[in-house]
Amino acid sequence: MGRIVVLYVDGAFGIGKTTVLRQIQKSAAYRFRRIYLEEPMRAWRSWFVDDHDAIREIYTTQELKDAGEIDLREASRRVCYAQVSLSAPFHIMNAVIYGIISGESEATSAHLGEGDYFVGVDRHPLASCLCFPVARFVTGYLEYTDLIALVATLPDYPRGASIAILDLSVEEQARRITERSRSGEHVNKTFLRILRNVFIIMYNTVAYLRNVSIDKACADREALEDFRGSQLESDMHKIDIQPRDDPNASETLFAVMASDATWRKNRKQSALFVYTMAKLDALLRSLNMHIVDINGLSQEQCAEKVVAISSKVPAVTARGNAPDLLFDAVEAYNADMGV
């Protein structure tokens, strides 16, 4: 009986995620049946109405904020709205995918071959409702309240998702973004570095949670100091943070979201904040996350690295017509979202 592997491919924008997934799709080197879920570009640019462009909205907002034409409160309102719009297609398709395969039993995915199925997904929902908002908070375009609101509304994603984070130098990323000249995109190396660091910090957060108990993580979060003015804030702006297998709490996303504003006069943290962080803890703790360094690699080599990861992550047994339903759903979505 065949197996189904769903692997999310993520990371900063302009680094080649879509190119890698296309390479896997078209390569004759693999015997398993494969498909990839494309970025929902139509939804981002003109979902139902032609003048709804969430990507342009964010970049325009950042430019207005930088020019002093709008304040942080207005910029944050606009960015938060745009991030919700960007997240919606991911939430929908995540529910579709797991609605089809959630009842299937787990299986080993080693050595995918003929009769097996690979579904590559261009971004996990966490990218648009966690990673990008965190990066925009760090760079001063999103208020703390709106960041926590976005994190608090994370849906209950199925546990155990597998994510391959592609990592590329900021210099090469900037070159690729300039080369592709996508409408509305701008090259801001400070933002690119911070966004790249957010994805690495997310990986480090998963590694940290793998090493500590729930109670220890909760105690560590209480001991964290305000992010603003911290060493982590400085590092996120100035250096390329590296993946670690044994990070401490001060090197995680929890440290980025640590704020004096969460403490009450009775010296207790806001219960709502504590519960929000516990929800994020539970979600991240369940993930299978891998870093793929793609610096200096060809498209074929990048594809090989991603496929190699697919043989190390959980799979589900392909029963009945589940594979056909899954592939039909992805094809319908891709046809609708293409621009």
UniProtKB/Swiss-Prot annotation:
InterPro entries: Herpes_TK, P-loop_NTPase. Keywords: ATP-binding, DNA synthesis, Early protein, Kinase, Nucleotide-binding, Transferase. It comes from the Viruses. ATP binds at G11, A12, F13, G14, I15, G16, K17, T18, R176. It catalyses: thymidine + ATP = dTMP + ADP + H(+). The active site is at E39 (proton acceptor). One of its GO terms (molecular function) is ATP binding. Its EC number is 2.7.1.21. It holds the Pfam family Herpes_TK. It is an enzyme of class 2 (transferase). The keyword ATP-binding applies. GO terms for biological process: DNA biosynthetic process; TMP biosynthetic process. The keyword Transmembrane does not apply. Substrate binds at Y59, Q83, R182. Catalyzes the transfer of the gamma-phospho group of ATP to thymidine to generate dTMP in the salvage pathway of pyrimidine synthesis. The dTMP serves as a substrate for DNA polymerase during viral DNA replication. Allows the virus to be reactivated and to grow in non-proliferative cells lacking a high concentration of phosphorylated nucleic acid precursors. Belongs to the herpesviridae thymidine kinase family. Homodimer. This is Thymidine kinase. The gene is TK.
